[in-house]
Amino acid sequence: MRTPLLLQSLKTRVAALHTLIGPLASQRHFSPRFDRQLFACRGARLGDYLTEAEESLTHLEAAVNQGDATRVAWLAERLAAQIEALQREAATATLRRHENAHLPGGRLHARLAEYQEYERRLLAMKNEREQRYAERHDPQLAREITALDERLTRCRTAIARTERALERITR
């Protein structure tokens, strides 16, 4: 039966998407990013849309358990489209970082997006090093992981400082 394989594949893609979008999840957007047919939520954060995709996966699992083939097909197609849309949005996050530079606080928003992109890249590098370290316990990899942790700490400090500056402006 292909349904369990499809369901497992979609679960894997949603988990990968969660890792990809994690650092971008709290990033605010000023305009809607997705079609109303694709996402019911109108949230200002990418994490809201990721949550809806995870809910779609839960609904799909329920439909599979109930044996409703038409609903399974529709939900699977919709979830795949949601995943693709979120992947495209994550890929274009760096291109959009300056889109609101003319608005009050726009430069701060651009800087925040830049720092969040740095954080995403540092997390990816750290995860890659940790996977390699788990395979072979190389002391050089341990030093690299420590250095990446320190860089992540500085990056997160910069993100927090920029968010506080944005809060002061928007009061």
From Swiss-Prot:
It comes from the Bacteria. The keyword DNA-binding applies. InterPro entries: PriB/PriC_sf (IPR038338), Primosomal_replicat_PriB/PriC (IPR010890). Pfam families: PriC. The keyword DNA-binding applies. Keywords: DNA replication, DNA-binding, Primosome. Belongs to the PriC family. Involved in the restart of stalled replication forks, which reloads the DnaB replicative helicase on sites other than the origin of replication. In vitro can load (E.coli) DnaB replicative helicase from a DnaB-DnaC complex on a single-stranded DNA (ssDNA)-binding protein (SSB)-coated stalled replication fork with no leading- or lagging-strand in the absence of other primosome proteins (PriA, PriB or DnaT). Binds SSB (tested with E.coli protein) and ssDNA. Complements priC in an E.coli priB-priC double deletion. Known ssDNA- and SSB binding sites are adjacent in the 5-helix bundle protein. Monomer. Component of the replication restart primosome, which is composed of PriA, PriB, PriC, DnaBe and DnaT; DnaG primase associates transiently with this complex. Interacts with the C-terminus of SSB. SSB interaction is required to load the main replicative helicase onto substrate replication forks. Interacts with helicase DnaB alone and in the DnaB-DnaC complex, probably 1:1 binding with DnaB. This is Replication restart protein PriC.
